[in-house]
Amino acid sequence: MAGVNEIRSTFLDYFRKNGHEVVPSSPLVPRNDPTLMFTNAGMVQFKNVFTGLEHRSYNRATTSQKCVRAGGKHNDLDNVGYTARHHTFFEMLGNFSFGDYFKEDAISFAWNLITREFGLPKDKLLVTVYHTDDDAANFWKKIAGLSDDRIIRIPTSDNFWAMGDTGPCGPCSEIFYDHGDHIWGGPPGSPEEDGDRFIEIWNLVFMQFEQQTPELRIDLPRPSIDTGMGLERIAAVLQGVHDNYDIDLFKALIRASEEATGVKAEGDFRASHRVIADHLRASSFLIADGVLPSNEGRGYVLRRIMRRAMRHAQLLGAKEPLMWRLLPALIREMGQAYPELIRAESLISETLKLEETRFRKTLERGLGLLSDASENLAEGDRLDGETAFKLYDTYGFPLDLTQDALRQRGIAVDTEGFNVAMERQKAEARANWTGSGEAATETIWFGIKDKVGATEFLGYETESAEGVIASLVRDGVEVPSVREGETISVVVNQTPFYGESGGQQGDTGTISGEGFVIAVKDTQKKGEGVFVHIGEVTEGTAKAGDVVELKVDSARRTRIRSNHSATHLLHEALRETLGTHVAQKGSLVAPDRLRFDFSHPKPISAEELEAVENLANEIILQNAPVTTRLMAVDDAIAEGAMALFGEKYGDEVRVVSMGTAKHGSKAGKAYSVELCGGTHVRQTGDIGLVRIISEGGVAAGVRRLEALTGEAARLYLEEQDERVKAIASALKTTSADVLDHVNALIDERKKLERELADARKKLALGGGSSDGDSAVEAVNGVNFLGKIVTGVSPRDLKPLADEGKKQVGSGVVLFIGVGEDGKASAVAAVTEDMVGRFSAVDLVRAASAALGGAGGGGRPDMAQAGGPDGAKAADAIAAVKALIA
């Protein structure tokens, strides 16, 4: 029986032997395609090839493409776990022809693979064709020997594919497998086609037309082929099972889930194990491709997937985060085919663990509220949409989790009412938002672009240039002229000023002409390639059409260049030190500092920070040239250039390289290679020095470095040195001996603190006076020690109570600690032999009530509480004694 990995390899090897380029799967986040949230088909990475906008070095390709369908119209989330073939993550096997072979070869390749390589019986196979596609029908007869009754003509759009309202399109031919008459269902096109007997295993798309208008469709000069076969589906067929979740891959993941929870995948728990197995794959691959859980966009979809799995983990009785413990099983099954799982293992593991830990409280609270809201509902009823929306809006409990939780009780959710409530909230938010003047001006730049064209950027070669004012904007309105004292925006036909993008701040400087000067305070990129110089007219009057001289603040630009280049070096140094899962998540390149956000699941140690800084400075000391090349984006990535997650790139990109690696697999090659449109130093030595000044977390799985370069770094080190000298002077020692003196002071302080704590403990246990009962006394035949103490922190009360239990031998202990702010903390303890008679929780709650507090908690033998009124400490002791009596 062939396993999933063997089936994948067989497919790719077959097409490689037949002249196809084996192309790696593209990321789950499509590059340069804002129309898609996730890659959901094999052809996505080739879309521009099919439309003629991009050319590859090959005209035949084959892939095993990672896909996610969990958002928008391709949303299978609610069905996952409850059906045999719904998944959020799946692999799409495919072969593609870009104007090379067409229908006959595509059908021949497909038929030979499934019958000869995979060995499927011919009598188990049938096909569909578009009802007017006689060519495809004839080729199936010729190549496969299929009779007319096994070639079904379908007149609907199910067998005609289109990329959109316009563009490439063409008929499809689908291959179906017959699981046998013991399963209900009819062939495609029949009234029973929705049954599970006949399952589509491969779709062949014949791109032969171009839809120019709704009424006009013409032949493509170079017809192409796009096919897709779900790996999980064909694996089920080849392994003799009818359910995708019974293939070897899912069996291994479900087995790991069973072992981790101690619950078999049977009965009501079967769906939960399946949900966890599927969602583990989707979550892990999305994180590996740079998506992190958040409250918007792709990150929100990921969070929904993760939280749905966590809800099912809770149903299985998991008391601790579960999914990260299953990651090793996934890596064993898929890590060889997709090494990004291995590369990002640490990030995936920590992200899963952190998200589940954070969500646990929300889940418990939400399920409790949902239980209360639905307690009077019976099977067949519906939870009203307003309640579902309140759970979502107020308590952060997603709609799909509400639906999932109620599904087991046969209760539906009024999704229409939920959507009405959601839209009402959005409308209220829009009505309450007044907007801003800046936002109101955004659309003006598109009109200016249409009128005068994009700005030509000259700033890579020069910091000064001449140009012509193309447009002047004041208060969001285009004006013919501006005068002294006015704050305005200027568009020039060409500029050396860099417009803010990629984290690099925009340039400042001056724009001057005959009789006027404009002080540029910022430069932004607006619309599509319009550079907007924002500033104030400091002298004279400027008019549209005036010839101007543009001068960038050179000193400021130099500092920005240094910080930007240092950012690249730090990025690579982080990857070398922490692992290749590190990816840029944001940056700020300013003249006075740099800030770099990156993916990493935990704080960086001092030793790791030092290693990162040393690696970056090592490249700076090389004084190596910083080179820039213009390349096609795919060629650049193929050469190893790092593309930033979420960044949009044109057909041609700038590739910035710097330094020579001295360590690891990159030794002797360029140290840092990134796609970047910013400005950089000419030699790494121009950076001078990089100094990391802080590191911390900014979001789940995202860390932030702040650093200085050049003169700013030197001044920072000088300031640090002055501080050390000042400390040394205060300690009457030298800078070299400061650390020894500080450590000695710390040791002495710890010693004094221990002595003070011991003295307070002795006093609390009977030495000295107190404001309440201090000695052990008998209350209703029970030994009781009650004591009010001051100068003892709340965390030290429990050790005191332990000592008190030893002193009473058998009985009850109560300590009330009163702080300098007048608030009180209370600890009650009950010896083991008395736990059956008294609960420390009940006792401490009585004390808390007397102190003006409420609640308290812990174990039957030890509990803690507090209260705002320490003056009532004696009353608290009396209240506990009353309970004992």
Curated annotation (Swiss-Prot):
GO cellular component terms attached to this protein's record: cytosol
MF term (GO), any: aminoacyl-tRNA deacylase activity
Principal location listed in the UniProt entry: cytoplasm
Subcellular location: Cytoplasm
Cofactor: binding comment: Binds 1 zinc ion per subunit.
Pfam families: DHHA1, tRNA-synt_2c, tRNA_SAD
Key words of the record: Aminoacyl-tRNA synthetase, ATP-binding, Cytoplasm, Ligase, Metal-binding, Nucleotide-binding, Protein biosynthesis, RNA-binding, tRNA-binding, Zinc
Keyword Ligase: yes
Statement: the UniProt record of this protein carries the keyword Transmembrane: no
Reaction(s) this enzyme catalyzes, per UniProt: tRNA(Ala) + L-alanine + ATP = L-alanyl-tRNA(Ala) + AMP + diphosphate
InterPro entries listed in its UniProt record: aa-tRNA-synth_II/BPL/LPL (IPR045864), Ala-tRNA-lgiase_IIc (IPR002318), Ala-tRNA-ligase_IIc_anticod-bd (IPR018162), Ala-tRNA-synth_IIc_core (IPR018165), Ala-tRNA-synth_IIc_N (IPR018164), Ala-tRNA_ligase (IPR050058), Ala_tRNA_ligase_euk/bac (IPR023033), DHHA1_dom (IPR003156)
Alphabetical list of SUPFAM superfamilies matching this protein: Class II aaRS and biotin synthetases, Putative anticodon-binding domain of alanyl-tRNA synthetase (AlaRS), ThrRS/AlaRS common domain, Translation proteins
Gene3D superfamilies, A to Z: 2.40.30.130, 3.10.310.40, 3.30.54.20, 6.10.250.550, Bira Bifunctional Protein, Domain 2, Threonyl-trna Synthetase, Chain A, domain 2
Co-factor(s): Zn(2+)
Positions of Zn(2+) binding: H564, H568, C676, H680
PROSITE patterns hit by this protein: AA_TRNA_LIGASE_II_ALA
Example GO BP: negative regulation of DNA-templated transcription
Enzyme Commission number(s): 6.1.1.7
Function: Catalyzes the attachment of alanine to tRNA(Ala) in a two-step reaction: alanine is first activated by ATP to form Ala-AMP and then transferred to the acceptor end of tRNA(Ala). Also edits incorrectly charged Ser-tRNA(Ala) and Gly-tRNA(Ala) via its editing domain.
Domain remarks: Consists of three domains; the N-terminal catalytic domain, the editing domain and the C-terminal C-Ala domain. The editing domain removes incorrectly charged amino acids, while the C-Ala domain, along with tRNA(Ala), serves as a bridge to cooperatively bring together the editing and aminoacylation centers thus stimulating deacylation of misacylated tRNAs.
Entry's family note: Belongs to the class-II aminoacyl-tRNA synthetase family.
UniProt protein name: Alanine--tRNA ligase
Organism: Brucella ovis (strain ATCC 25840 / 63/290 / NCTC 10512)
